[in-house]
């Protein structure tokens, strides 16, 4: 038994090391790749200082943090709701951020700065989160709380559709492209949003013990002495914050929060002590690679990164499911 535990521990360490190397390689490739390839030796030349340090580095850091946040959010939701299909957009938090953003564009008549739009997106996500917490205080079951989140997401999606359909604003139509996900407008002015993600990411990665209890189910978690109501509220709030900041940075991006945790579980990473940091590394790597494809696929334009993640990720996910079933 002890030998099996040690073998599993060594395997987990190898997985984390491999994911760390993959993320580092993806990060370096993201800094080098673009309309102009800039090798490591040219990073400190005048051309490298402009393209690498001023343009590509803030975008790369944003992609890394958003990928980690979305993947961890997916892992938290899948444990919290005992549903492998749970993901950050399921509770309506992403759509709530979109409603906040569209309201800011309409009320500000397209004149608000980017930082104000970001704050409105976060506010929209947090409002949906507060509504969910209100439902949670009524001690609803996990399945009913999940259904409440789905209903809120549908309402927010309808509000966005009505607002965009009846709008003649060019900015609002461009906002539809932004809601498909993209990092084209990210620079150092959005560094405050990146910093807002880091403490929550680190805190959740340290909560493996309650996460492991939640993954056992509500009844088992209560029997083990876990204050279920408290942890459900805290984790929903933390997830709402991460998703709101991510949408403010890059728009709505699918696939990462749904598939990355599921893929890692299929690979044998079920303990949240390994799964949470593994999701952060794998989510960051996957989104970095998707962002590189989005930048380089077309010569004169940039693809929405949400389209890239779905196109590349869905076949891999189906293949892994078929392989696991065998």
UniProtKB/Swiss-Prot annotation:
GO terms for biological process, alphabetical: cobalamin transport
Cited PANTHER family: FERRIC ENTEROBACTIN TRANSPORT SYSTEM PERMEASE PROTEIN, VITAMIN B12 IMPORT SYSTEM PERMEASE PROTEIN BTUC
Transmembrane segments: 15-35, 61-81, 88-108, 112-132, 146-166, 184-204, 240-260, 274-294, 302-322
A GO-annotated cellular component: plasma membrane
Topological relation to the membrane, as annotated: Multi-pass membrane protein
Assembly and interaction partners: The complex is composed of two ATP-binding proteins (BtuD), two transmembrane proteins (BtuC) and a solute-binding protein (BtuF).
Function text: Part of the ABC transporter complex BtuCDF involved in vitamin B12 import. Involved in the translocation of the substrate across the membrane.
UniProt gene name: btuC
HAMAP family: BtuC
Keywords: Cell inner membrane, Cell membrane, Membrane, Transmembrane, Transmembrane helix, Transport
Cross-referenced CDD domains: TM_ABC_iron-siderophores_like
Family matches, as Gene3D superfamilies: ABC transporter involved in vitamin B12 uptake, BtuC
Family: Belongs to the binding-protein-dependent transport system permease family. FecCD subfamily.
Protein name: Vitamin B12 import system permease protein BtuC
NCBIfam families according to UniProt: PRK03784.1
Molecular function GO labels: vitamin transmembrane transporter activity
Subcellular location: Cell inner membrane
Superkingdom of source: Bacteria
């Amino acid at each position: 038994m002890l030998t099996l535990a040690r073998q599993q521990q060594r395997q987990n360490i190898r997985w984390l090391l491999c994911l760390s190397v993959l993320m580092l390689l993806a990060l370096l490739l993201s800094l080098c790749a673009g309309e102009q390839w800039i090798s490591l030796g040219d990073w400190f030349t005048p051309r490298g200082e402009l393209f690498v340090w001023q343009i590509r580095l803030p975008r790369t850091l944003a992609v890394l943090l958003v990928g980690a946040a979305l993947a961890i959010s997916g892992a938290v939701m899948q444990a919290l709701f005992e549903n492998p299909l749970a993901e950050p957009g399921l509770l309506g938090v992403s759509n709530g951020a979109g409603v906040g953003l569209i309201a800011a564009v309409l009320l500000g008549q397209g004149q608000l700065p980017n930082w104000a739009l970001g704050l409105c997106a976060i506010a929209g996500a947090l409002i949906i989160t507060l509504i969910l917490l209100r439902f949670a205080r009524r001690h609803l079951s996990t399945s009913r709380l999940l259904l409440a989140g789905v209903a809120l997401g549908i309402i927010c999606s309808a509000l966005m559709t009505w607002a965009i359909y009846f709008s003649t604003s060019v900015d609002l139509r461009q906002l539809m492209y932004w809601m498909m996900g993209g990092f084209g407008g990210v620079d150092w002015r959005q560094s405050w949003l990146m910093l807002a993600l880091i403490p929550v990411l680190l805190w959740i990665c340290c909560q493996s013990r309650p996460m492991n209890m939640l993954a056992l189910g509500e009844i088992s978690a209560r029997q083990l002495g876990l204050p279920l109501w408290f942890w459900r509220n805290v984790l929903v709030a933390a997830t709402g914050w991460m998703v709101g900041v991510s949408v403010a940075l890059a728009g709505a991006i699918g696939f990462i929060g749904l598939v990355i945790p599921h893929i890692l579980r299929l690979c044998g990473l079920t303990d949240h002590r390994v799964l949470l940091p593994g999701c952060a590394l794998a989510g960051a790597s996957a989104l970095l690679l998707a962002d590189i494809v989005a930048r380089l696929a077309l010569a004169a334009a940039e693809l929405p990164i949400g389209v890239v993640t779905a196109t590349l990720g869905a076949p891999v996910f189906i293949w892994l499911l078929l392989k696991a079933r065998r």
